[in-house]
């Protein structure tokens, strides 16, 4: 039994106690405004056959929590008591003891004073949705995933990837992997001290420590951990004092064989307004790129999410979402949630036509219709070859490689089938296109320069 689980003699009291902790975690994670809007009036009613029954004040609140937060609430309950298998949310109270969690302490992480600097609760900063189990792996993220798992599974020893530097665009899974590392360590090696926070919070805590003359406590907090994870390190660019403190913290941890995990929106070499000595150290370990999603990865993410939410979505709707929402995973999941919520509240069936109407504004603001011809022109220009080379059969490497990249991008950024793509490249068959895509995916596994090049091409085409 995990040391984090709550064991009481009376099972009813146990679940009431667990609900108090779950409510506090919801408050810590989502903040006061959202908590008061959705959770503050939710009651614990009873437990039956390992099912927790909660009561919402209205049908609207019940349906919204079910569609948006039921999986999160269940995972939180299971964190404290793994005998809980499901939750049920009703609107009519049942006889028996109820507990409403309405007034919670308003103290959040940002309010922690110096006397509490060393009592950091990593659980309050981790998102229960972000674990290795629900991270969908594909060619764009498999190196980063494997490295993150290696760090998490190192069982107290420092992994070979130290520091682990994850970089890529917004919403592609970097933060998910960092949270997953934290959860895995907490569950399998809870004695290890782990801190996860954004670079922005690191800076604010440092400034607060300077103002309150408590820098020693600040240093002790961050330099005594086993694993330090800093998200969005680009935030400290141009902030000299914070960079200086981060530099010494980095050196202390690395010198003492402590693990560091850092995320950024660009590679270390592309960071501006940051000291060269920091830039150099960020690249000491493993630098793993999380690059833009492919159609197949987006499809896998949607199918995984749909299975978790236990809903039925027509295949043409799933294909439509995977083809049209190409910018990042966060936006893809947001679009899916919007479609499901609309169906729940209007009681309308999920169809392709309804989905197109629901997401009309999102698609209009986001969509830059990319054609195979657009891709061919951009890649040909980038590699200084003739546009006609895209449809030729020339096998010279300086022509064949850009053509393969253009085929790869055509599959990633357009809804075209392999056969349709082949027609645009001199009437080549689908097996030729498939071979080109696989060849590029193999190269992406080890060629950091090529990954950056393709990421750049994707951004240019999408914008």
From Swiss-Prot:
Binding site for ATP: 171, 173-175
BP GO terms, sorted: DNA replication initiation; regulation of DNA replication
The entry's keywords: ATP-binding, Cytoplasm, DNA replication, DNA-binding, Lipid-binding, Nucleotide-binding
Region Domain III, AAA+ region: start-end pairs: 125-343
UniProt cross-references to Pfam families, sorted A to Z: Bac_DnaA, Bac_DnaA_C, DnaA_N
UniProt superkingdom: Bacteria
Renumbered residue ranges of the record's region Domain I, interacts with DnaA modulators: 1-83
GO molecular function annotations of the record: ATP binding; ATP hydrolysis activity; DNA replication origin binding; lipid binding
Region described as Domain IV, binds dsDNA: spans on this chain: 344-463
Region (Domain II): 83-124
Subcellular location: Cytoplasm
Main localization (coarse): cytoplasm
GO CC term (a single one): cytoplasm
Keyword Ribosomal protein: no
This protein's domain notes: Domain I is involved in oligomerization and binding regulators, domain II is flexibile and of varying length in different bacteria, domain III forms the AAA+ region, while domain IV binds dsDNA.
Function in brief: Plays an essential role in the initiation and regulation of chromosomal replication. ATP-DnaA binds to the origin of replication (oriC) to initiate formation of the DNA replication initiation complex once per cell cycle. Binds the DnaA box (a 9 base pair repeat at the origin) and separates the double-stranded (ds)DNA. Forms a right-handed helical filament on oriC DNA; dsDNA binds to the exterior of the filament while single-stranded (ss)DNA is stabiized in the filament's interior.
Entry-linked HAMAP family: DnaA_bact
Family: Belongs to the DnaA family.
Oligomeric form and interacting partners: Oligomerizes as a right-handed, spiral filament on DNA at oriC.
Name of the protein: Chromosomal replication initiator protein DnaA
Organism: Rickettsia rickettsii (strain Sheila Smith)
């Amino acid at each position: 039994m995990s040391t984090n689980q709550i064991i009481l003699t009376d099972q009813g009291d146990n679940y009431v106690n667990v609900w108090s902790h779950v409510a506090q975690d919801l408050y810590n994670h989502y903040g006061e405004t959202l908590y008061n809007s959705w959770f503050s009036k939710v009651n614990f009613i009873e437990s039956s056959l390992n099912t927790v029954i909660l009561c919402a004040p209205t049908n609207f609140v019940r349906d919204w929590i079910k569609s948006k937060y039921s999986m999160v609430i269940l995972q939180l309950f299971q964190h404290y008591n793994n005998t809980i298998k499901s939750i049920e949310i009703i609107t009519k109270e049942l006889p028996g003891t109820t507990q409403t969690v309405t007034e919670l302490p308003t103290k959040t992480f940002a309010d922690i004073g110096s006397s509490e600097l060393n009592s950091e609760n990593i659980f309050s900063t981790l998102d229960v949705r972000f674990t290795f189990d629900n991270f969908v792996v594909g060619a764009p993220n498999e190196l980063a995933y494997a490295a993150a798992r290696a760090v998490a599974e190192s069982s107290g020893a420092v992994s070979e990837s130290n520091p682990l530097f994850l970089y890529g665009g917004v919403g592609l899974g970097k933060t998910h992997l960092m949270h997953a590392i934290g959860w895995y360590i907490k569950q399998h090696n809870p004695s290890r001290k782990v801190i996860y926070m954004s670079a922005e919070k690191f800076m604010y805590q440092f400034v607060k420590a300077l103002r309150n003359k408590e820098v020693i406590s600040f240093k002790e907090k961050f330099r005594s951990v086993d694993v330090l994870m800093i998200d969005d390190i680009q935030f400290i660019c141009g902030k000299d004092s914070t960079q200086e403190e981060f530099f010494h913290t980095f050196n202390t941890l690395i010198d003492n064989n402590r693990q560091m995990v850092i995320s950024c929106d660009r590679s270390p070499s592309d960071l501006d307004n940051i000291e060269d000595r920091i830039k150099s150290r960020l690249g000491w370990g493993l630098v793993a790129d999380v690059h833009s999603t492919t159609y197949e990865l987006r499809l896998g993410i949607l199918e995984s999410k749909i299975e978790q939410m236990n809903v039925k979505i027509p295949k043409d709707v799933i294909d439509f979402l995977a083809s049209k929402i190409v910018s990042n995973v966060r936006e893809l999941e947001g679009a899916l949630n919007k479609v499901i919520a609309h169906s729940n509240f209007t009681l309308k069936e999920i169809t392709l036509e309804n989905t197109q109407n629901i997401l009309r504004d999102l698609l209009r603001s986001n969509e830059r219709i990319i054609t195979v011809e657009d891709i061919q022109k951009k890649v040909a220009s980038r590699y200084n070859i003739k546009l006609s080379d895209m449809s030729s059969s020339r096998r010279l490497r300086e022509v064949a490689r850009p053509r393969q990249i253009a085929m790869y991008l055509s599959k990633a950024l357009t809804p075209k089938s392999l056969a349709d793509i082949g027609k645009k490249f001199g009437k080549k068959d689908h097996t030729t296109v498939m071979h080109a895509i696989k060849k590029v995916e193999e190269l992406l596994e080890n060629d950091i320069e090529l990954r950056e090049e393709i990421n750049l091409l994707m951004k240019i085409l999408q914008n």
